[in-house]
């Protein structure tokens, strides 16, 4: 089993449940979701590392958040995750902690269940462009 690739991920308890995660073969990963999915903060993309032990994948990513109403309120978020890979799906959980830039905890831990499905462009049909 191999986690490397692009995944559609649902984190039910997150401010916006739908995410895209990319796992690279060098043990790095990326996480992204729509900026305005979270109405309270603007969040950067998440960037982190992962490792596998059999079918169990664990890791963490870093993101920065800024309060939409008080732009001077900046936090560093660290999201840890662990899930079990089953072919082209995974199930597990994540926990997020948010800190001031000096390292003082501000929020968390915030937990959520994770489910993921491998993205394969061959399984999606894209409508042909109209020739008007």
Model-derived segments and spans:
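Short beta-strand segments enriched in hydrophobic/aromatic residues
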Residues: 11, 63-65, 96
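N-terminal glycine/threonine-rich, aromatic-flanked beta-hairpin/loop signature
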Residues: 16-58, 63-67
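Acidic, glycine-rich flexible loop segments
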Residues: 61-89
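Short, cysteine-centered beta-strand-loop-beta hairpins and adjacent loop/turn segments enriched
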Residues: 37-41, 66-73, 98-108
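Hydrophobic/aromatic beta-strand elements that line small-molecule binding cavities or substrate pockets
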Residues: 19-22, 46-52, 76-85, 95-96, ...
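Acidic surface patches and DE-rich sequence motifs
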Residues: 11, 24, 100
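Tryptophan-anchored aromatic micro-motifs
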Residues: 1-16, 46-48
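Edge beta-strand at a domain terminus
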Residues: 54, 96-132
């Amino acid at each position: 089993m191999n986690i490397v690739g692009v995944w559609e991920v649902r984190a039910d308890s997150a401010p916006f449940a739908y995410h895209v995660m990319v796992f690279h073969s060098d043990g790095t990963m990326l996480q992204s979701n729509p900026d305005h999915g979270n109405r309270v903060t603007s969040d950067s993309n998440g960037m982190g590392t992962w490792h596998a032990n059999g079918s169990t994948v664990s890791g963490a990513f870093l993101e920065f958040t800024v309060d939409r109403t008080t732009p001077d309120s900046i936090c560093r978020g660290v999201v840890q995750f662990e899930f079990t890979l089953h072919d082209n799906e995974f199930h597990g959980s994540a926990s997020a902690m948010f800190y001031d830039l000096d390292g003082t905890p501000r929020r968390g831990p915030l937990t959520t269940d994770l489910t993921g499905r491998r993205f394969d462009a061959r399984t999606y049909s894209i409508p042909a462009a109209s020739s008007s």
